[in-house]
Amino acid sequence: DVLIVDDVQECDRAMKFYNALCPYYQNNMIEIRQSEPYSYCQFVVGRDHTAFGRARHPFMTGSGGWAYFSATGYMLGIRPDFEHLTIDPCIPADWKEFSAVRRWRGAEYDIHVENPDGVMKGVQELYLDGEKVERIPVMAQGSRHDVRVVMG
């Protein structure tokens, strides 16, 4: 399960699972898959069937939503709750940085995560608009903020 990434060693494994399920990485068999190259499908026909490998019902599944939820909330680690925006990535060690934009409660957060030591999990420093903070609170609607995260 991609959502369960609470152990540091699971971060690389979660990325491998995510990539295995990602439609982009299945484009090398598009003639067999016979589905849009960008869509998650409800099911893929099993090996005992004559249509083995074909993907069906691309827009009748919750897989796309769950893939987004898993990737943004648990791998990139950007999770809103009632009072705070948590950023706690669980990424492959070879990712040196990534950026994301998150709109939450009417405010926009430009998030840049740095990983100078090549760790898979652990936030060393968190900055909101250049000021070191412990947590990111709800900000005013219509406002825009820079968030810098240093892993380590």
Would you name each region that the model predicts?
Residues 2-152:
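Non-catalytic C-terminal accessory modules of carbohydrate-active enzymes
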